[in-house]
Design a protein with these regions (language model features):
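Active-site and donor-binding regions of nucleotide-sugar-utilizing enzymes
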Residues: 85-117
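Glycine-rich beta-strand-to-loop/alpha-helix junction loops that act as flexible
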Residues: 63-64, 94-96, 229-230
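ATP/NTP phosphate-donor binding region
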Residues: 1-90
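Active-site segments that bind and position negatively charged phosphate/pyrophosphate groups
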Residues: 191-287
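A glycine/threonine-rich phosphate-anchoring loop and its flanking beta-alpha core
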Residues: 14, 28, 105-194
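Short glycine/serine/threonine-rich phosphate/pyrophosphate-binding segments
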Residues: 98-104, 126-127, 235-236
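Short glycine/proline-enriched coil/turn segments at helix->beta-strand junctions
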Residues: 28-32, 51-57, 112, 195-198, ...
Length: 289
């Protein structure tokens, strides 16, 4: 499957099972490449990517929101400088949303911007954060406080890599697809009520929703704010728990449940979240969130 995104810099999203082993069909094997990944990404995936590009350097950071820091950013940029990376070279993100944010901001910052390709490896990043051009790091405990809008050259998605995700991580990422269904695509929402989840279709339809919104409002001046449904309260929960205990999708689920007014839709959402083993109860005090 191929999705073309039209914005300040057009790019394509490719969605295909087994794509990770065919990257050489999409990327020039002779390019000098700085691959940023983390220690949560299975080593077999990192080796599968790096072995296809003889002129690549694999830089692995510690997983978690702590990777989105000035210290890690500086380390990445310093490593690139020491290895004589130029404006003609390429940064690849191989990981989840944190790695996409970090690597994208590294690419946007180095020599005023070099090419960037995103290869998302988590449900959340394949469904949501790999499209839209938002790249950022955190500051003083505030998520995404320093960043830019920087579009990738392309996004390459292999649904098969999701098979190695822990169940909680897998389900956590699906919340963004549920959100996309609620704001724009009734049929996407209904996919979660079927007996078996069609993950490839869920990813595809979720990307189409975000593509439509991003093309209308790339820099979040109006319509794109609809993508923040559930996120205002969700981010408050994330701050309350100091980015621990609850994952991003779980916090967004709490936010959506808190803001939904239609009792029928709220009940359907509750059943879907229960099926995905996402707890919508928490011990946070409302006056502290």
């Amino acid at each position: 499957m191929k999705i073309h995104v039209t914005c300040s810099k057009d790019y394509d999203i490719y969605l295909e099972k087994g794509l990770l082993e065919q990257l050489h069909d999409y990327i020039d094997c002779q390019r000098k490449i700085f691959i940023i990944s983390d220690d949560n990404v299975p080593e077999c995936y990192q080796q599968t990517v790096s072995k296809q590009f003889p002129n690549s350097y694999l830089h692995i950071v510690k997983h978690g929101e702590g990777a989105k820091s000035f210290a890690v950013l500086e380390d990445c940029l310093t490593q690139m400088l020491r290895r004589n990376f130029s404006r003609k070279d390429l940064v690849i993100a191989l990981g989840g949303g944190v790695i996409g944010d970090l690597a994208g901001f590294v690419a946007a910052s180095y020599m005023r911007g070099i090419d960037f390709i995103n290869i998302p490896t988590t449900t959340l990043s394949q469904i949501d954060s790999s499209i839209g051009g938002k790249v950022a790091i955190n500051l003083d405990g505030i998520k995404n406080c320093v960043g830019a809008f920087y579009q990738p050259e392309m996004v390459l998605i292999d649904p098969l890599v999701l098979n190695t995700l822990p169940k909680r991580h897998f389900y956590n990422g699906l919340v963004e697809a549920i959100k996309a269904g609620l704001i724009q695509d009734k049929e996407l929402f209904e996919l979660f009520e079927q007996e078996e989840l069609d993950i490839e279709q869920i990813i595809y339809r979720s990307l189409l929703v975000k593509k439509y919104v991003v093309e209308q409002d790339e820099t979040e001046q109006g319509l794109r704010k609809i993508l923040n449904f559930g996120h205002t309260i969700g981010h408050a929960y994330e701050s309350y728990y100091h980015l621990r205990d609850y994952y991003h999708g779980e916090c967004v689920a709490l936010g959506m449940m808190a803001i939904l007014k239609n009792p029928e839709i709220k009940e359907r959402l509750s059943k879907i979240l229960e099926r995905l083993q996402i707890d919508t109860t928490c011990d946070a005090k409302k006056d502290k969130v």
